[in-house]
Amino acid sequence: TFIVATVDKFAQIPLNDKPAALFGITNSKKPPELIIQDELHLISGPLGTMTGIYEAAISKLCERDGVCAKVIASTATIRNAANQIMALYGRSHTQFPPQGLSAKDSFFAIQSTPEEKPARQYFGVMGIGTTATTTLIRVNAAMLFATRYLATLGYPDAVVDNFWTITGYFNSLRELGGASTQILDDVQSRLDYLAKTKFVSVYPGVDTSKGYTYTEELTSRMSNSEITEIIQVKLKRSYTKDNHADVFDYLLASNMISVGVDVGRLGAMVVAGQPKTNAEYIQATSRVGRDNPGLVIAVYNASRSRDRSHYEQFLKYHSALYRYVEATSLTPFSDRARDRGLHALYISLCRYLIENLRGNSQAINYRSDNPEVQKVEKIIIDYVRRVDPDELSAVMDELKDIQDAWDIAATGSLVYKSRKNEKKLLKGDTENDRFRTMNSMRNVDGQSGIYLLGGL
């Protein structure tokens, strides 16, 4: 059996007893024996912290006769992997492929020369004495002109297709929205100027009469079906002399493009400002030049000190990109993480490992002095002792609070969850209660209200 899932569904484990079948608890089937986690670098920060708590439950539920499921996690951008793996899975790790004796030949991968397999070429642009908007307009117009000039020179369709669609990467939806307007107006005006005035005697023949404004965006504002159609259908339309009007001129994207976009024909990208993390920069720019040579132009904002620093250190930075990948942070048993997820871990293990606590109406059967319940407590304590021993004392105290609260709640009628007025153990994520439980992990950050006082 092959199961495809996302980590945000982990939040359903304490809320529902049906997933017990996936672990072979309610049937005679075996639990999962192999877990493949793609894009490990994304399981970091608040999401990774909460995932680490639920992974403690999944690790135990997949265990049979002391043997845990094997985990294979893949990523191209990670640093301090040992700590991340320990915090996320509670295990040591083995890196594959190993470094080998030579960085150029590890047996599993061999370094190729630019002549053998051309890759991406990076350029940095920073306008001095002009605004970042003007610089971005001029760079986009120059890219548009250059790619269209390939067609004018009569290059094969396959070569032109590789650079026809220009991908724009933006750090915020606000910047992306502004660029969308600029492409329809300012970029086209600048393109006309380049074709009819500045380059008319040097690079003649570029036709700008029809305009190149076929633009699509790839952001969280799109629905799942729209995103699928863009990636699987529209982006894969190849350029020919007869159908160029049906091929995107621009693809404007947020950080969504960093994952899951594998379109070989994309070969040109304009990056508007240095992304927030180096891992994000590597992942985003690797979307172009995957099958053919690629060109990435990073447009820096001179008014931002971080952008200026990257521009000044451009050669050094790009000669060792992976050296600057940030270490990820996971703290699954920190104070705020325990507030939001420790009870979910405890309840999940109680429901799945103790038969008379499994059903929705069986929450009332809980007794903290039950030997099976005490085994669950020991499982969690042993896990925390291995993953984050500094938090062990605090975890033990909070487990005692959770047990006392469940003991008190179990004195009357009690269910795990209910949409009716029944007394329920697991409360909604917005309720102010010890047992408030997330329904999904798509939004794991806590929120704080800000009140402005008059006269300030």
Residue ranges with predicted function:
Residues 1-2, 100-107, 154, 159-160, ...:
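Conserved C-terminal RecA-like helicase domain
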Residues 79-87, 92-186:
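Conserved interdomain linker/interface between the two RecA-like ATPase lobes of SF2 helicase motors
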Residues 257-273, 294-298:
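A short beta-strand element within the Helicase C-terminal
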Residues 287-321:
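Conserved segment of the helicase C-terminal RecA-like domain
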